[in-house]
A protein has these predicted regions:
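N-terminal, positively charged/glycine-rich alpha-helical extensions of SAM-dependent methyltransferases
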Residues: 1-12
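Conserved alpha-helix/loop element of class I SAM-dependent methyltransferases that forms part
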Residues: 8, 15, 19-42
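Class I SAM-dependent methyltransferase SAM/SAH-binding core
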Residues: 43-45, 51-101
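A short hydrophobic/small-residue beta-strand
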Residues: 66, 141-142
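A short acidic, Gly/Pro-enriched loop at the edge of an enzyme's catalytic core
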Residues: 100-112
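A short SAM/SAH-binding and catalytic strip from SAM-dependent methyltransferases
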Residues: 110-123
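Conserved class I S-adenosyl-L-methionine
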Residues: 142-161
Length: 161
């Protein structure tokens, strides 16, 4: 169902100018990759990767080695099939696991990102603790999440970004 409605990228992206929805999604993902300063050969973790649309796009864009993790085995199988079909299985792979208990060694990633995923964690502090554990010292975690507040004031410029 998600793939039919959203394509391979199950996330929001604001539209700019005459961008298509697909172009907006790519810009959103490329911005995230650029903020992480990803480069060829870096090992990167996508927490809550779905079927791996952003993982494949970021791997193509940066030539980094992207590992996606999702709790859903169907998504792993579908995503890995798409990695192979799109010719990026040497750069991107998906694994089944829980971001509350990441199945990776300490300090094993040059960067970690999550796109609208960690908001679903039952214990965000534990989830972010796991992310910190698998990040190499000095590496960055980047995250896009929905945030809601009753105190939103749209006239405040910094809240429109």
């Amino acid at each position: 169902f998600y793939e039919w409605g959203w394509g391979a990228c199950f996330h929001f992206a604001d539209r700019r100018g005459r961008e298509t929805f697909a172009q907006s999604l790519l810009r959103h993902e490329y911005y995230l990759a650029s903020r992480l300063a990803l480069k060829a050969g870096d090992c990167v973790l996508d927490c809550g990767c779905g079927i791996g649309g952003p993982a494949r796009n970021i791997a193509r864009f940066t030539r980094a080695q992207v590992t996606g993790i999702t709790i859903n085995q169907f998504q792993v199988d579908r995503g890995n099939a798409l990695c192979k079909q799109e010719g990026v299985s040497h750069l991107a792979k998906l694994v089944q696991g829980d971001f509350m208990n990441l199945p990776f060694k300490d300090s094993s990633f040059d960067g970690v990102y999550a796109i609208e995923a960690t908001c679903h964690a039952p214990d965000r502090a534990k989830c972010y603790g796991e992310i910190l554990r698998v990040l190499k010292p000095g590496a960055t975690f980047a995250c896009y999440e929905w945030c809601l507040t009753d105190a939103y004031d749209g006239s405040e410029r910094h809240k429109k970004r």
